[in-house]
Structures are given as structure tokens and as C-alpha cells.
């Protein structure tokens, strides 16, 4: 078996058939760029940001994803997140497994309903020196609202605000399949 490295690795999987288990979420595949966004929470000032989201596969029962966001005006890098969206074969159960650049890892589980996904955190881990407040709960939705339009909404609760509140909303346009 050849050893694959760097870009050759991702290029080599472009013709791999999609795993049967993830056909229910193949509508996510591709590269998406934000066209509208907002961030808010009771403890911060509202803001806008830009983001690119990429969903790909390598023939396994999961999609790989990455989210890269930056400040709307300055272009300064903000949030980075990467992980997997894994489907329990033969079901509509899905798990969202992510690592984030500010020291948080999440496991969210939920269901796929048509062209929508509803998730809720089951485990949130954080590095010992992450700054407060502590995120204690996350709920996330993905919804394909038109053939090339995807929306994501993220709700959260923290050690300071224990009720789940909307934190992020973004509408993406597909820019590459």
C-alpha cells in the first residue's frame, strides 16, 4: 500500500465512492462560504464574521469537516474547528466530533431529518488553562434551505449563563463541490 502525504492524500480520495452510511448527509459535501452571519450572547457585544466550511469524505462512514472564521473587517483569524460528522450505519443518528483552537473538544449527538441535522452536546472537554466562562452545553443545527444554501445555528450555555441561548448564526453559499 503506498504511503500518501500532504495534498496527494486528499487528491487521491476524490474518486472514492461515498460510504452508504453518509448518503443521508451528502448534501453537506463541498466548500461553503458565509454570505451573512451574526454572533451574540448575553455576556458579549454582537458581532459579524466571515467563515468557510468544508465537508469532505474518504469513503468511511463519516464526513470530515473544517470551519475557519475571520473578523469581518480586519480579516484577523478567529475560530478554527475541525472534526468528523459520523453516521451510525442504518440509522439517522449522527455524531459531531470536533477540536477547536481555543482548547475545547466537543462530542454532540443527534439526528438527521431530511436536509437538516439537530445536535446536542453529550461531552465538552477543555484544556486546563482555557479562559472562563466554561461552555457547559451546546446545541447545533444545520439546515439546507435551498440547493446551494446552508444555515448553521449554534446555541450554548456557560458557567455564567446557564440557560441555552443563541450564540452563532451563519448562512453559507456553496462555492465548490
Task: Please provide the spans of the model-predicted regions.
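A short secondary-structure junction signal
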Residues: 107-109, 131, 152-155, 164-166
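Short, surface-exposed beta-strand-loop junctions and turns on beta-sheet-rich folds
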Residues: 71-72, 102-104, 125-126, 158-159
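Helix-adjacent hinge/juxtasegments
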Residues: 72-111
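A short, structured loop/turn motif at beta-sheet edges
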Residues: 55-61, 86-92, 110-117, 143-149, ...
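A structural detector for short beta-strand units
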Residues: 51, 81-83, 106-108, 138-140, ...
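Amphipathic/hydrophobic helical signal segments and adjacent flexible N-terminal regions
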Residues: 2-62, 66-77, 137, 147, ...
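Acidic, glycine-rich flexible loop segments
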Residues: 103-104, 118-139
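Short hydrophobic/aromatic-rich beta-strand segments that constitute the beta-sheet cores
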Residues: 34, 63-67, 93-98, 117-121, ...
